[in-house]
Amino acid sequence: MQKTSFPKSHAIVPSLFLAAALTVNVNAQDAPAGNAARGKAFFEGNCAVCHSPVLGPENLVVMKQGPSLVGVVGRPAGSLPHFNYTKAIRELGYTWDTAKLYRFLENPMEVVPGTTMPIPVADPRNRADVVAYLATLKIPQGVTVKFEELPETVGGTDPNDWQRQSPGAQHHLKVAALPKPFETKSAGNNPQVVTAPTNATLAVPPGFTVKLFAKDLRNPRLVRTAPNGDIFIAETGPGRIRVMRTTDGADAPTENRVFAEGLKGPFGISFYPPGDKPEWIYVANRNSVVRFPYHSGDLQTNSEAQVIVPKLSETTGGHSTRDVVFSKDGKRMFLSVGSGSNVAEGMEKKTPEEITSWETENGLGATWGSEWHRAQILVTDPEGHQPLKAFATGVRNGVTMAVNPVTGDLWVSTNERDGLGDGLVPDYVTRIKEGGYYGWPWFYMGNNEDPRHATARPDLADKAIVPDVLEAPHSASLEMTFYTATSGAAVFPADYRGDAFVALHGSWNRGIRTGYKIIRVLLKNGVPNGQYDDFLTGFVVNNHDVWGRPVGVTVAHDGALLITEDGNGTMWRVAYEKDKYAKTDLPISRSPKVVVRR
């Protein structure tokens, strides 16, 4: 374990870039006065899922998805050792003070293009309060902080470790084989995103090719294909929806336009009504659902967004992705809303009588307070006339959903909780049962109680549903799509038809990283057996660096699989070319297929 002290504050003249970016308060010494007590409450409800405000045991700096904020005021931007900042933050060239934090938090991705900090604090009072609280997070005088040392290479036999990934590798995680909580310590191992090394490889199964399809995308997230074959991409940071057009068999788009902009954290995209002739494009923003009139072939909207659901929840902090899909018959609109926290640490307690009354109105296992309408799949009608209600609860962060076009089943791809060690808790994809409770925050994977809520909800024992397909813990399961193509220049072999593909964004809360790949979930008549296979791997350079983070996956008009990754802002195209060995437009290692089971 390495010991060090944070760098002391020092004055640095901002670069011309920063002078332009930080146009408000850049020369001020302080932010507007705020209330630190209110700021602490706001932080706990909106920021604590990604940032720690305290040191750990033995003065260990606690890393989460975001850096520790202990000592942030007076610290040079991007300087905290052992946290892999984006290049944009590393190159800021100044020291954080309250004025700069106040401006940054107003709209992080606008103030510092390239940062992955997704959530603004738009309300000036809340922003002043949280900055006032951050100013209180000081390192005690005389204290030397410590940083966790992380391994560089795989030292064990875990088949989920990044060095053991290979197309065709099989995984079948089972609840009975899960470790106990805290069997290993909770690691803070964020990746450093680098440009693709000269020897970078992407591996796919024999017969497939993978090529770069598009680049220079800004924060590309979810991607969906319109019935006519146009490709719609949510660029969440800039607040816009991009559309690309391509010809069958082509390795690049022929058109690349911005369909709509000025949106607030857009992520989910859906075409309505279902079928070949949609009339609307729905977009799930951070805390609303809007739609645009649409005719097949439109590359740019000429209309203002129509608000369908003005507010999804009372709070927007924590997990910020929202998705929208429609039932197969088009009568219901489903919305996924992730939790505001890791495991509802600050949620106040209720009496058994209060819980019974609450669940009568909100559903079994529904959370309350700042977690109201969070960690749920919500449902209403496509016009938003019916009040939002819980379709399923206990789904910690259902990042994306998909409706099986054959069976009509609603599926969700979910990020589970952190902090219980490398081996807990599995992320998952699963069919969603109406009225179902999936465990968060009190239980996980069925009747496994989270020790951080021990004995809090004995009434929920044996009521949590075990998901269909358990993924390696901390994989960060993002978009999923069903493969239904039956023809086209790049169509996959028939045995892929009906299966699902899932993008795994990759771990941060694991000593040896995992994920950063595309997996294939095996289905028979729409029913999973719990197994998934590695399909595309190769984005990890070492246990410190990666050159891609998969987010979105969709099936193109010609049967190819299109993949977005938000590390370097690229899109990749995977096509099947009969009788050809797996290849990429990057050099590829021809290592033998590895099969691992668990």
Which positions does each model-derived feature cover?
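Electrostatic cytochrome c docking/interface patches
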Residues: 27-44, 55-62
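C-type cytochrome heme c attachment motif
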Residues: 41-55, 67-71, 99-106, 115-118, ...
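C-terminal capping alpha-helices of c-type cytochrome domains
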Residues: 95-145, 561, 566-567, 576
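Beta-propeller domain segments
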Residues: 151-206, 278, 321, 339-389, ...
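Surface loop/turn motifs at the tips and blade-to-blade linkers of beta-strand repeat domains
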Residues: 212-217, 258-264, 308-316, 390-394, ...
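Hydrophobic beta-strand segments that make up the repeating blades of beta-propeller
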Residues: 231-233, 279-283, 332-335, 410-412, ...
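Asp-box/WD-like beta-propeller blade repeats and closely related beta-sheet repeat scaffolds
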Residues: 254-256, 260-266, 270-272, 279, ...
